[in-house]
Amino acid sequence: MKHGFIKVAAATPRVTVADCKANGEEILKAIHEMEKEHVKLMVFPEFCITGYTCHDLFLQRCLLDSAWDELLHIAEETRETDALIFVGLPLRHRGKLYNVAAALNHGRIVGFVPKTYIPNYNEFYEQRQFAGAEEEDVEFVDFLKCEKNEEDEIWDEIPFGT
């Protein structure tokens, strides 16, 4: 932290469609590069683990399982990383498929942020595969506290969700 600010970075790793293992390695390479620059908040694109253009492959258990396994691998490989990391993947939950950003911190999955607006026009027909998160689908959990003022000992809890 410098002057009360943290370093934030958005990464765009090389992505191979439906090759979660290769994409995970590219994500880890980017994370390690950002670590060298002392980045504390790392954000990756939606579906960076699977690739955005998987279309009907998103409905295949094999791809969903591979994406989940790779998320666990990325979490394990970043247990020593002092940063909050967001990576995108498809996630099945309660019978629905969501486009989510998974939040990772020190090797733990601390939450998921589901996409709320699912486009369905022109080349975007995500509603064919994905559900949008409704308020009743989202559970808010306290996962981060930020100090308001160094002189006060007042802390605000930041809700996690959409």
State where each predicted segment sits.
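Enzyme catalytic cores with a strong preference for nitrogen-chemistry domains
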Residues: 1-162
